[in-house]
Amino acid sequence: MRTFNYSQEIQNLLTPEIVQLLTCIHEHKGRQDLFLEANTDELKTLVDVAMIQSTGASNRIEGIFTSDKRLEALVRKKAEPHNRSEQEIAGYREVLALIHENHDYISPAPNVIRQLHRDLYSYSTGAIGGDYKNADNVIAETDAQGHQRARFIPVPAFQTADAMDSLCQSFQNAWQENIIDKLLLTPMFILDFLCIHPFNDGNGRMSRLLTLLLLYRAGYIVGKYISLEMLIEKTKTTYYEALQASSFGGHENQNTYAPFVTYYLGIIIKAYAEFEDRIQYLVTKKISKPDRIKAIISQTLGKISKKDLMERCPDISQGTIERTLSSLVKEGYIIKVGSGPATAYIRKQ
């Protein structure tokens, strides 16, 4: 069975590239605390939007969908779930809110992880949450011809409980020793969790919830304001490539954490960059909302959509964004391209 020796593995991760990523995130975290102290009112808007985006994105990655209108209503608890997909979305909302509010009191022990999984399925019919898998599972992929092949074979069902106990104990020991940077330890734990794949269903969503939990416990709370899940969704292909590269040879303890760790550090940096960008716009009270929209467009290379602007300006209504875009088109400042859902805008050169 796989062993987890984080102290030994860490030496292989201290490459110039990863060290540079760590330095960048540490610098962002230093500024994070200043932003949090100075902009309390503006941050609530970001939290509300990120909650909706995170819940939607993490479920969409797993093929669980609902409309944007229904998603917002479910996350804001203004609607009850109508089907299985919405039940799972509502469950994700509950666990995400729990982590937001109580992360300091939630330790990633096996029984706690099972309780979080139980809550993930708290709206679902049938007792499928909270229990480890009762059958072996295979991570498969389908090629262009429709043929399936095994991408990864996780830990067998009968070894799952022991593997989770070993994983969590090794992780807790490394966390408490405080020798390994927690920015490295977190994605290492998440990779090993995914390689065990302890549940029949919900492993991907649990991995993203656990990522937020561990980052929050380490003091990196950017995921509360910027949706890490949405950033992962937007780079899903790269995510799966990094996961596959790092999981190969895992059963023989011959795998490398580097691709997966590098990917996750890049996601965190992207989140911090977006966080600082949005805060700057939110606190710029002297600039009108239409001028803020125009400023964002002026700094964007290539196309930008209405949805992009709504994500970057969560305090500006959809109507204001639509009117501003229409006005800028009439002025000749931007050009409208595409139609329907594919509509986007490009700044006229």
Predicted features by range, described:
Residues 1-349:
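FIC/Doc superfamily catalytic core
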